[in-house]
């Protein structure tokens, strides 16, 4: 299963559009190491605000959050926990990224 998470460029400040692609790759790499197995993260910029912040996919097929939760529960994982880990880590990662210069 793939969890697609879109990050707003503004989370990196007024010049965020310049850095968001690189930052998304860093976040994706970090979470790929933490969630080995049935879950893959796709962290991408959210340039289009009409697209949802989070999507759930199995192959090319998208499905609802409820179905994603049931799928993960059947595999012994919890969607709330996975999303919480990302949401807790993001502010720290943003802070570290902005302090890199």
Protein language model regions, located:
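Short, extreme N-terminal segment that most often corresponds to the first beta-strand
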Residues: 1-16
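Short, flexible N-terminal segments of the mature chain
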Residues: 16-37
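Surface-exposed beta-strand edges and their flanking turn/coil or helix-capping segments
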Residues: 18-20, 56, 71
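Short, intrinsically disordered low-complexity segments
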Residues: 35-69
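A cross-taxonomic marker for long C-terminal extensions/tails that follow the last structured domain
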Residues: 72-101
